[in-house]
Amino acid sequence: MPASITGLLRPDIAALEPYTPIVPLETLAERLGLPVERIIKLDANENPYGPSPRALAALAAVEHDAPHRYAIYPDPDHTRLRAALSRYVGQPPERIICGAGSDELIDLIMRAVLRPGDVMVDCPPTFAMYSFDAALYGARIVAVPRTEQFDVDVEGVAEAVERDGAKLLFLAAPNNPTGTPLARTTVERLLDLPIILAIDEAYAEFAGTSVIDLVGTRPNLVVLRTFSKWAGLAGLRIGYAAMHEDVITYLWKIKQPYNVNVAAEVAAVASLDDLDERLSTVARIVAERERLAAALAALPGIHVYPSAANFLLCRMTSGGAARARAIRDTLAQRGILIRYFNRPGIDDCIRISVGRPEQNDALLDVLKEVA
């Protein structure tokens, strides 16, 4: 690119390390020389059972009975979905906003809070998008590492807030990629600090715990949720957040008007109408998580961390990072995809999403060969 053009672009973005997303399934299949149906995806914490039958039926009904809906812009206020979410989470629609996945809502919160030079606390190892998005807005990121068991260092966070004037903290509950639950008492202590606390509950349905009931009574609390994991709608990009009315007005001002597409809203509403089926699927995944964890823990040289999510973090107690990478690569050659993170504190770990029983058995068969 000519220097005259690059001079018009932000130099801080040129220096930014790009986020590494999951490679598309078809690309991976071609790279591995395997048919798509042979690939077992245990790398992105997706729902192995897919969307609910009612969601699929609702999408088919739109295509068959009202295809014109795809030709007109969607409801900018997400009226039907927010009403359904209000019934689901017990918060009024006025405290709920929807987005194209919780990723968009993370971005909106940072856009509303952070100016260049402002400070955000990050608690690694955690979801990398928090620090990535903060860097996009020119924020200074103060890292307060988690404990050996991946709990939040509350005193360290409080010190960073007092010392650096931090304005914002994102915490995944349960944490990704460790699966660590976040105690309600920890959240309540952090809410006493002069910061906006955003709790990312992407895996809340698997954990069975939430602090969304505190929204409204604690003005500095934001709770984010997604339909990607428990509802099996990752490909449609639909999430939501609940927060105090004084805060949510800022997000309504800056969000794109038609940010949630018609198909996503239809499928999300139908998923909430099919709640018993969805929660039954969640229960199956949780039960399979425990079975898989026990089987992995029985393998030599692997420590499995307790998880409240739909994935398991496993540390190599022998062989370190080289062994973790080798296991990932060996599994990939067999068409089984897991996640490896080249990050401090977890570079000798692999993360395994909980699949169907037969998928997990295929994983275990290979691990028994190479462990």
From Swiss-Prot:
Gene Ontology terms for molecular function? histidinol-phosphate transaminase activity; pyridoxal phosphate binding
Mind telling me which SUPFAM superfamilies this protein's record contains? Answer: PLP-dependent transferases (SSF53383)
The record's Pfam families line, in alphabetical order, gives: Aminotran_1_2
Q: Which top class of enzyme applies to this chain?
A: transferase
Modification sites for N6-(pyridoxal phosphate)lysine: 229
Metabolic or biological pathway, per its Swiss-Prot or TrEMBL entry:
Amino-acid biosynthesis; L-histidine biosynthesis; L-histidine from 5-phospho-alpha-D-ribose 1-diphosphate: step 7/9
Superkingdom in the source lineage: Bacteria
Q: Which Gene3D superfamilies match?
A: Aspartate Aminotransferase, domain 1, Type I PLP-dependent aspartate aminotransferase-like (Major domain)
Keyword annotations: Amino-acid biosynthesis, Aminotransferase, Histidine biosynthesis, Pyridoxal phosphate, Transferase
Q: Which InterPro entries match?
A: Aminotransferase_I/II_large, HisP_aminotrans, PyrdxlP-dep_Trfase, PyrdxlP-dep_Trfase_major, PyrdxlP-dep_Trfase_small
Documented EC number(s): 2.6.1.9
Amino-acid biosynthesis in keyword set: yes
Q: Which cofactor does it need?
A: pyridoxal 5'-phosphate
Q: Name one GO biological process term.
A: L-histidine biosynthetic process
Q: Which reaction does it catalyse?
A: L-histidinol phosphate + 2-oxoglutarate = 3-(imidazol-4-yl)-2-oxopropyl phosphate + L-glutamate
Annotated PANTHER family: HISTIDINOL-PHOSPHATE AMINOTRANSFERASE (PTHR42885:SF2), HISTIDINOL-PHOSPHATE AMINOTRANSFERASE-RELATED (PTHR42885)
Provide the assembly information: Homodimer.
What is the similarity comment for this entry? Belongs to the class-II pyridoxal-phosphate-dependent aminotransferase family. Histidinol-phosphate aminotransferase subfamily.
Q: Which protein is depicted?
A: Histidinol-phosphate aminotransferase
Name of encoding gene? hisC
